[in-house]
Amino acid sequence: MRNSKGFTLIELLIVVVIIGILAAIAIPKFGATKDKAYIAAVKSDLRNLSTAEESYFADNVVYTTSLPTTSFSSSAGVTVSISAANATGWTASAVHASLPTKPCFTFAGTGGPSGLATVEGEIKCTP
């Protein structure tokens, strides 16, 4: 009788196939998670911009289109732009460098609607 202390080739192949199947399932889910994190950063920046705009308005009785005049700074990779601002409202959009085709929009007061945002204060992103 033979003394076997290792794995057979078939057993090793089965393990490799199982690992391959698990990787094929996990990798696409990881990619979608990364995109969700980028969108969350963009939405967070637009919420922070809203707070900065309201703070600026409280001091100056007008909204601003200039980001340096507010206390706002965006997250890494996020570009925020204020397309319109006056004494009664403002409109802004933001996009992450890794998702350039999925911008998000928001507005306040008479600044909107903007992009997909149709309700004041709501942040809407391109699906």
List PLM regions with ranges.
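Short, intrinsically disordered, low-complexity terminal segments
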Residues: 20, 34, 89-91
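Regular, well-ordered alpha-helical segments
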Residues: 24, 32-35, 51, 55-58
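Conserved catalytic core of two-component sensor histidine kinases
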Residues: 16, 43, 50
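Periplasmic/extracellular, small/polar-rich flexible segments of pilin-like filament-forming proteins
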Residues: 47, 51-127
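Aliphatic-rich helix starts adjacent to a transmembrane/signal segment
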Residues: 29-46
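Compositionally biased non-globular segments, especially hydrophobic aliphatic-rich helices
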Residues: 11, 40-43, 120-121
